[in-house]
A protein has these predicted regions:
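Conserved alpha/beta-hydrolase "acid-adjacent" motif
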Residues: 97-107
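Catalytic active-site module of serine/aspartate enzymes centered on a nucleophile-bearing elbow/loop
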Residues: 115, 119-171
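Short, proline-enriched alpha-helix->beta-strand connector loops that line the catalytic pocket
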Residues: 82-88, 115-118
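Alpha/beta-hydrolase-fold enzymes
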Residues: 3-53
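Acidic beta-to-alpha connecting loop that harbors the catalytic carboxylate
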Residues: 94-97, 128-129
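Active-site nucleophile elbow and catalytic-triad environment of alpha/beta-hydrolase enzymes
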Residues: 59-80
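Short beta-strand/loop motif that positions the catalytic acidic residue
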Residues: 90-92
Length: 171
């Protein structure tokens, strides 16, 4: 009976939610909310806390899907199958508890590099927490993403232009 209730798609477990999320504020001195781990921007945290589309307990199915995604993303096959010429950008706050304060990101980058992916850029934002796009220095983050995209899209366009040039006939 317990398993049937627990794994019902609409069941919401406060216990499971606490097990997953509760420790994320652990390294924050005097947190004001349970969501302070998301961002240093108090206005963003306040909006998050008051938004019913953000502030809710996952369903059992939601947690199952989250854990499935994490498992697949960390599967060695994923790293092996990644195209070796695929440019990757990793961005993270160095105070993000989900990424284990940079350790998880560095581990992931090393796994990609160990599987032959060479074109990887990593940016850690000082004192930023989990949601780097909602942090106090988000304009810097947006600029870094824009620069990275422009650089890689321009390089791709240049490669495609060279590939499409007609070969000149030998004289």
């Amino acid at each position: 009976e317990f398993r049937r209730v627990l794994f019902r798609s609409t069941y919401r477990s406060g216990l499971l939610s606490n097990l997953v999320f509760k420790g994320f504020n652990r390294k924050i001195k005097q947190p004001k909310t349970v969501f302070d781990w998301l961002s240093r921007d108090e206005a963003v945290v306040s909006l998050y806390q008051s938004d019913e589309k953000c502030n809710f307990v996952f369903t059992a199915t939601g947690f199952r899907d989250l854990f499935t995604l994490i498992t697949k993303a960390n599967n060695p096959v994923t790293f092996r199958k990644t195209p070796k010429d695929l440019p990757l950008l990793f961005i993270s706050g160095d105070k993000d508890p989900v990424g284990r304060y940079g350790e998880g990101v560095r581990r992931t980058v090393n796994l990609y590099r160990g599987n032959g992916v060479k074109n990887i850029e990593v940016i850690f934002y000082k004192d930023a927490r989990h949601e780097v796009l909602n942090e106090l220095d988000r304009l810097e983050t947006f600029g870094d993403i824009s620069r990275w995209l422009e650089t890689h899209l321009a390089a791709r366009a240049a490669r495609q232009a060279v590939e499409q040039e007609p070969e000149t006939a030998a004289e």
